[in-house]
Amino acid sequence: MAKPIMIQGTMSNAGKSLLTAGLCRIFTQDGYRVAPFKSQNMALNSYITTDGSEMGRAQVVQAEAAGKAPDVRMNPILLKPTSEKGSQVILGGKPIGNMTTTEYYAHKHNLLPHIKRAYESLSQENDIIVIEGAGSPAEINLKRDDFVNMGLAKMLKAPVLIAGDIDRGGVFASLYGTVMLFDEDERKHVKGTIINKFRGDVEILKPGLDMLCDLIHVPVVGVVPYLHVDIDDEDSLSERFSKKGPLGLIDIAVIKLPRISNFTDFNALEHIECASVRYVSGTNELGNPDLIIIPGSKNTMGDLKWMRENGLEVCIKKHAAKNKPVFGICGGYQMLCENLGDPYGVEHGGEMKGMGLLKSTTVFEKEKTRTRVMGTFSKVGGIFNGLSGKTFEGYEIHMGYTASEEGNEGDSSLSNLAEISGNEKPDGMQKGNVYGTYVHGVFDNDEILSEIAAALMKEKGLEYEKHTFFNLKEYKEKQYNLLADALRECLDMEYIYKVIEEGIENGNNETNGY
């Protein structure tokens, strides 16, 4: 059976996901069989495994760092918010329905056996399990039915390291307050703290670290600097969205929908050296981009209504009327249609007018499509005609289908897909310079990136030599190794290994982590 180590954080975005990924890579480099585990993740960023199961992207990253194929056992429960008060509940990789917060808390005790089975199964195949907590472990109103933080640590007898984000301020208060709010049986699990996202001279910080240790009787395992590694990380979402910089020769605007999902679709675009990728949420931010992308959404009708009310829909239509390209992915593709129907109340229920840029209709259904695909672009028209015949890989996660309207002669399918099952089907639609697809990950292909860059540069009268940008797999491996190297420099790994070996019975909390 595997030995556990758990990373908790004083708050959301404290850096738990990245620290977990880094430890997974370190332990793997050191020759151990390693797997990540997060009992419950709440995120709009998800991934489809080879067997069609859906799981959180953070655990996919951690699995890759551990050299493992993503496995839904690593994230048995995924909550995908559909509104301010409700989420779609994914259990064991499959949706079991939408629930309000109240309904979920009434139901969650039924989920505990699924968590135990998933963990025990992983434990039999690995030497170390790196567990990630969720949010803050000191939410005293949620302790009774907790199975994501200290409730899980107690169930699995896991030692805990608690991370605090010093970049946002108040790290000593948050670490002290978190530990002091723990019950006595919870405190015995806490074997160290980590100061995360530090900028500056550690020497100036040391007096505070000593005082913190004296107050909570828990050692500081390390001070982690603000790391600049390019890893698909839930915690970096707000930073990615707010990043400002000069416009590139190519200006790509991604609409920052309120319920944007699978934002990792656009990470690869940031590797086009002559391009800038901006996330915009208002007409005052849109400007005059060369390409507008409407991303996936967990609530297509709600986010279309939001765009309609804030004026972005009109701006996108004007952009398309100038024969400038618009690309919709999944929910964004659905918004481009003439009509949207929701006969089963999957989202809002009823019918809604779409943007009308593609002559098609979307109908939401109860069953969710979840599959990995291989695709080949059809004969593509418009600015991106160079994509014709190019191949790609990706995955589908959506409710319902989109069909061309009767008598429509102007639009055609964008690509042909082959599912893992062997089933083949057309996907997406195109008309002029408006394109839509259900496939996530369509840009994660070097040849496709080069074609898109060349087309946009040519449209502006600029020369562009098609070339290789990067090998995505090799690039990710390099980033995971950089993360591991950085953590080895600043964490007391000898102490962490000792904690893993001795578990919660370890009473000698001596470390020189800073």
Curated annotation (Swiss-Prot):
Pathway recorded for this protein: Cofactor biosynthesis; adenosylcobalamin biosynthesis
Listed name of the protein: Cobyric acid synthase
Organism: Ruminiclostridium cellulolyticum (strain ATCC 35319 / DSM 5812 / JCM 6584 / H10) (Clostridium cellulolyticum)
Listed SUPFAM superfamilies: Class I glutamine amidotransferase-like, P-loop containing nucleoside triphosphate hydrolases
InterPro entries the record matches: Class_I_gatase-like, CobQ/CobB/MinD/ParA_Nub-bd_dom, CobQ_GATase1, CobQ_N, CobQ_synth, GATase_3, P-loop_NTPase
Known role: Catalyzes amidations at positions B, D, E, and G on adenosylcobyrinic A,C-diamide. NH(2) groups are provided by glutamine, and one molecule of ATP is hydrogenolyzed for each amidation.
Domain GATase cobBQ-type intervals: 249-448
Gene that this polypeptide is encoded by: cobQ
Lineage, uppermost ranks: Bacteria, Bacillati, Bacillota, Clostridia, Eubacteriales
Keywords for the protein's UniProt record, in alphabetical order: Cobalamin biosynthesis, Glutamine amidotransferase
